[in-house]
């Protein structure tokens, strides 16, 4: 039996991952008896110069696989993106299919494609990517290939992807609802139902959810996310209320107010292992 650990959204550069963080992560993986680690996208903003060296360092300690997220695609050609898509690994009678996924705006159907493009090109990270096709077309091509891959497999199927495959995980806050268009597509869930997929691990949206079953599919969403969003950052202000700011809902501002404090660095060292555990999904295959 192989014990697989899944994580997503490490964002190495934004979270200033160094040797201490890497060693702490390895310690957690060892304590949890992880035999194989899979990273489900958004490892960093520079795949070749940061993500790959990080993965190669981890691979000296245990097998590591990955799929891309949108942040990983920066500076990659479309050919390189395709190279890392649709990897299939077999563990006993279980198959792990990994892919990036994409989005088609269908989570916000009331707005036109033109409106979505204006929003994307004004606010969204993916405006920096140079993909040759439009988003709905990319998604249709990904779905078509995924359909073929899933149809070829027998036994237990596990899918790891980056983007959101079901509307139940969308953002409900009115300001952020327009960005749901760039999170994924319900069409992925429909394919998972069609092919009897057992487990799906994903990230992209930096909210951690308890595992839940929808139409027989076990969904797991526990992204690490940005340090300003971490539980330990939230808890720091409970332990040190004297550092609270007036606009605590402004995650950037509250983190910037404490990131240089010795107390925060010590608190992070004490609680980082637990943060990693909260962002780890474990499946036995």
Where are the regions that the model predicts?
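Conserved beta-sheet core of the metallophosphoesterase superfamily
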Residues: 56-58, 65, 92-95, 166-251
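Active-site-proximal loop/helix segment associated with metal-binding centers of metalloenzymes
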Residues: 98-154, 163-175, 247, 253, ...
């Amino acid at each position: 039996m192989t014990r697989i650990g899944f994580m997503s959204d490490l964002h190495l550069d934004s979270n200033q991952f160094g040797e201490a963080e890497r060693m702490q992560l390895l310690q957690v993986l060892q304590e949890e008896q992880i035999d194989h680690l899979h990273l489900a996208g958004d490892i960093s903003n520079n795949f070749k110069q940061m993500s790959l060296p990080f993965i190669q360092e981890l691979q000296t300690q245990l097998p590591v696989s990955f799929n891309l997220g949108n942040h990983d695609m920066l500076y990659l050609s479309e050919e390189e993106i395709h190279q890392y898509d649709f990897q299939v690994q077999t563990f006993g009678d279980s198959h792990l299919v990994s892919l990036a996924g994409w989005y088609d705006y269908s989570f916000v159907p009331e707005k036109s494609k033109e409106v979505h493009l204006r929003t994307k090109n004004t606010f969204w990270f993916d405006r920096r990517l140079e993909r040759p096709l439009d988003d709905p077309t990319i998604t249709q091509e990904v779905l078509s290939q995924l359909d073929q891959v899933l149809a070829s497999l027998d036994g237990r199927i596990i899918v790891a992807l980056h983007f959101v495959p079901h509307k139940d995980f969308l953002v409900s806050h009115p300001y952020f609802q327009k960005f749901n268009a760039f999170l994924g597509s319900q069409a992925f869930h429909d394919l998972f139902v069609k092919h009897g997929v057992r487990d799906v691990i994903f990230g992209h949206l930096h909210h951690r959810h308890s595992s839940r079953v929808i139409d027989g599919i076990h969904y797991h969403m526990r992204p690490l996310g940005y340090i300003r969003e971490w539980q330990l950052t939230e808890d720091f202000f409970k332990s040190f209320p004297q550092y609270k700011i007036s606009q605590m809902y402004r995650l950037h501002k509250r983190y910037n107010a404490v990131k240089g404090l010795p107390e925060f660095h010590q608190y992070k060292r004490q609680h980082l292992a637990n943060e990693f555990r909260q962002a780890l999904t474990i499946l036995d295959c």
